[in-house]
Amino acid sequence: MRWLAPRADASVVLTRRPSECLAAPADAQGAYLVELGRAAFRTPLLLGGQAARAGVQCETCHRGGRNNPDFDFPGISGAPGTADVTTSVLSSHRGDGIDNPKPIPNLSGPKSALKVSQDPASPALESFIHGIITQEFDGDEPAPAVLQGLAAYVRALSPGACPSRATEPVTAAAALADVRRTLQAAIAALDHNDGASAALMVEAARSQLGDIDERYAGPALAEQRAALERAGADLAAAESDARRVAPSARADITIWLADEPAWSRPVLAAEPASLYSPRQLSLASH
């Protein structure tokens, strides 16, 4: 329930999200880069400094690759849905001492409404994203393929690809599907002999499991939390091996994916008692 506008109903905002307007590329290399970028977009590990410690990710301001009218971060937002990208709260590079929050742009809206060119022939978007990571959020230098992937993901967001329903439920099943998708991106990065990107993907998957864990609060769900924590720990060796592009990394991830349905079944069965449930979230927020 962090960074929600005071009048936002957490039981609605945190149990539904904007549907993703993603036009997946038809070519294999393009699809690979989009998957890398999509996963990186959804992990705070991409960023640095205060943002990473607070759990901020690209998805925080751009839910579903859109915007976030309910975003309200102390010292960064003015009105809900705005952010000051030149604040020293999150950046040691771009702080200008001026309180000037601006509306968060909708990355899935018309390309003409965005200030940075998304022409694939131009490096402008990659340069802009690089500045966001390393300057605006004090992050480390991203792996080249991750930077390319983030740009590819943003370019693939299109109003023409928006589903008929503007929002979709936030569920444990969807969250676990994202974990699997992120690990498939890790395997693809290993196939590209890219240890840095593969390691980030495994780290991102572990972080996603932690996010799911947070929704299973309370003594009654201790068994489900333990299963999620074991699942995260089981990826630790794969993360280390991925960085070295060791053959064992691919094997570890493949085994993890094969084992996931068995341990996740009780987790999914307990979802109605978790904070994925609008009712449970409403009770917890009052």
Language-model segments: which ranges?
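Periplasmic c-type cytochrome electron-transfer domains
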Residues: 1-286
